[in-house]
A protein has these predicted regions:
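Thiamine diphosphate
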Residues: 2-142
Length: 142
């Protein structure tokens, strides 16, 4: 929808592999309407946000977050006729980002990251934006 509403803008979706699976049927629209949407999948084979919460607040007692049987996102993109590629290193990503942004077509980049890579900053339950957890994994203003 963002690309349809802003045809003259570059639209980039940054999404985890779990989140992408919840909405991947939307890529049909990219192909059907030839939309130049760029999709960058952060693929750690986990429901990343939930896993991170379970790591930080539940002593790594992981429950129902492992996505070991992820589909092949590159093959899914290819099946829809969308240019798709898997990246496994930071250098690959840095090299491809420029090509991605300059492309006039829809693109899917499946970026493989460490399984337990965390995303910061984050706001813990019951805290405010001013009490977010920063880069070092500690409360900023507690």
């Amino acid at each position: 929808g963002a690309q349809v509403g802003a045809r003259d803008k570059k639209v980039v979706l940054i999404v985890g592999d779990g989140g992408f699976q919840m909405t991947l049927e939307e890529i049909m629209m990219i192909r059907q309407y030839n939309l130049p949407v760029k999709i960058v999948i952060i693929n750690n084979s986990f429901l990343g946000m939930v896993r991170q919460w379970q790591e930080l607040f539940k002593d790594r007692r992981y429950s129902f977050v492992d996505l070991e049987c992820n589909p092949d996102f590159v093959k899914i993109g290819d099946a829809y006729g969308i240019k798709s590629e898997r990246l496994k290193t930071k250098a690959d990503l840095e090299n491809k980002l420029k090509d991605l942004i300059l492309s006039d077509e829809g693109v899917i980049l499946d970026c493989i990251v460490e399984k337990e890579e965390n995303v910061f900053p984050m706001i813990p339950a019951g805290k405010t934006v001013s009490q977010m957890i920063g880069k070092k994994g500690v409360l900023e203003n507690d």
